Amino acid sequence: IIDEIFKDIKNIDFNRVIAIGGGSILDVGKLLALKDVSSTKKLFKRELPIIRDKELIIVPTTCGTGSEVTNISIVEIKSENTKLGLAVDELYADKGVLIPELCKTMPYKAFVYSSIDALIHSIEGFLSPNSTQYTDLFAFKAIEMILSGYKEILEKGEEYRNTIMDKFLIASNYAGIAFGNAGVGAVHALSYPLGGKYHVPHGEANYQFLMAVLNFYKKNNGDGKIIELTKLISSIINAKEED
């Protein structure tokens, strides 16, 4: 589909891309700001020159991707039954605009999956060996905002999410800063084939592997940053750390 879009716009003269939508739309928008892309697959396999020649403005309508502050694009490659990622500075947006009202039309299920994606972005960004004190600040705050937001929704009902949508959208942005600099880990790596082959929504695919990966980390490096993460989550949800 992306290759067909490139064919359609090949002879159109434009100098700005405004991408408004969820993660997939934003990731495609980033690619449309590049010059002379003939094959998405070749682009993602670094077989084509990557040249940015258009202004890029990103406006997310979900609270999960953080794409407005990352240099990452993820696409499904059907011929290989998986997803591939491209991370280059040419994919950074010139401007990112956060408008909570645009997220309020999301169905509840889409909200859950997208916000879980942001939560996992922040968790993996924090646990990444490439994390820094800077990225940890954003990761910790994102985790706190998302989990405390979930608690409010549990207490006041699912429609209450729209009252605090700005909280989730900013948390997604913070998570984007965290993982955009520190990277993600095994949860995302394992989820790509699940999404690429079976079309499982990205947030749901990540969720399927989250606890198994965290338990593996705890078993193999129980004295690492997993302890700090456990303490943070326990303090937010008022649970004992051993739970």
What function would you assign to each model-found segment?
Residues 64, 174-203:
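Glycine-rich phosphate/pyrophosphate-binding beta-alpha loops
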Residues 1-6, 239-243:
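Short, intrinsically disordered, charge-balanced linker/junction segments flanking boundaries
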Residues 72-182:
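Carboxylate- and glycine-rich phosphate/diphosphate-binding segment that chelates Mg2+/Mn2+
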Residues 28-33, 122-123, 143-149, 172-176, ...:
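Buried hydrophobic packing segments
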Residues 7, 34, 38, 181, ...:
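Short, well-ordered alpha-helices that flank and scaffold nucleotide-derived cofactor binding pockets
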Residues 2-7, 11-100:
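Glycine/threonine-rich beta-strand-loop-alpha-helix active-site module
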Residues 197-243:
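Gly/Pro-rich interdomain helix-loop hinge
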